[in-house]
Amino acid sequence: MAGKGTQTPPYWYDGSPVPWAMRLLAPLYAGVTALRRRAYRRGWRKHYTLPVPVIVVGNITAGGTGKTPLTIALVERLRAAGWKPGVASRGYGREDADKPLWVQADTPTAKGGDEPVLIAWKTGVPVRVDRDRVAAGKALIEAGCDVIVCDDGLQHYRLARDIEIEVVDAQRRYGNGRMIPAGPLREPVSRASECDFRVVNLGQADEESAAQACGFGQWPMALHIDSAQPLAGGRARPLAYFKGQRVHAVAGIAHPQRFFDMLRARGIGVVPHAFADHQAYQPQDLSFGSQLPVLMTEKDAVKCRAFGNDWYYAVPLRAELPAAFWVALTDRLDKLRPN
């Protein structure tokens, strides 16, 4: 049996009627969320401030919006600028969730969580998973990090932050605009205006269409794919190698259609296989009855490495943002650098 992932209710985004039970529960969720936030704002509950800068990359909707590609790009930029970044994450869906853990590139995703393992695999920086992000930040500082990047955690108010980056999907935005469970919102849409940076994930949009899709004060993020890395090891192939071929495309992410569309844009014949987000794969899940190449996202690949073979490929995703975004971010961060 395949491990179950998380499915997004269709009525969050497709305009279909919201069940009455969900409508009745949404105000309760909204009230609890507002009360908790007010408690931190008014000092009834205390923030904890770490002695190094803290950057939170998050969203106000449930599910994926492109936070992890941005986190990876951010870590690489910070390292190039002379910082020693570390990443703190909750590690959604992992086993022994109450147990803090250092995540390595070879940590099983069941133990470390999909996104933390992917970040460790791609960047090599210290990655700490812990329900308590304050404790995770302290551990990263002890490990020598001088800036903390939180992958998700916009709503984890106990940890004070210096920079907030909201990531929103350009296609789905805020869905039906309702709070969980009637809609995708963790917090009201107005919360987004309080973030220091709003990044709009445009997928494979080009520079011209990116500029048109983003409003004032929003930064476009384009996603690019160029190659495919065999899971069994060996030299990567350019995606042009698969042009004109049929392939099985596997995506267990929040918005799998985006991955399929990106492959099709490269002239690849896609046989799509959409799985739930955070799917725990078993070998039989990828037995499609043919020897066509299997191309998958890197988030899926880290969960399939144990049974990878010569025709399973991970397709690296690269996030690209305007140079002005990085200038604005590093300028803000440099002001926080200790003398």
From Swiss-Prot:
Q: In which pathway does it act?
A: Glycolipid biosynthesis; lipid IV(A) biosynthesis; lipid IV(A) from (3R)-3-hydroxytetradecanoyl-[acyl-carrier-protein] and UDP-N-acetyl-alpha-D-glucosamine: step 6/6
Q: Which GO terms describe its biological process?
A: lipid A biosynthetic process; lipopolysaccharide core region biosynthetic process
Could you list this entry's UniProt keywords, alphabetically sorted. Answer: ATP-binding, Kinase, Lipid A biosynthesis, Lipid biosynthesis, Lipid metabolism, Nucleotide-binding, Transferase
Q: Which reaction does it catalyse?
A: a lipid A disaccharide + ATP = a lipid IVA + ADP + H(+)
GO MF annotations for this entry? ATP binding; tetraacyldisaccharide 4'-kinase activity
Alphabetized Pfam families for the sequence? LpxK (PF02606)
Q: What is its EC number?
A: 2.7.1.130
What InterPro entries has UniProt attached to this entry?
LpxK (IPR003758), P-loop_NTPase (IPR027417)
| GO cellular component terms, A-Z | plasma membrane
- Binding-site residues for ATP, renumbered to this chain: T61, A62, G63, G64, T65, G66, K67, T68
Q: Give the domain of life.
A: Bacteria
Query: Mind telling me which SUPFAM superfamilies this protein's record contains?
Result: P-loop containing nucleoside triphosphate hydrolases
Question: What family does this belong to?
Answer: Belongs to the LpxK family.
Q: What does this protein do, in the record's words?
A: Transfers the gamma-phosphate of ATP to the 4'-position of a tetraacyldisaccharide 1-phosphate intermediate (termed DS-1-P) to form tetraacyldisaccharide 1,4'-bis-phosphate (lipid IVA).
Protein name, entry field = Tetraacyldisaccharide 4'-kinase
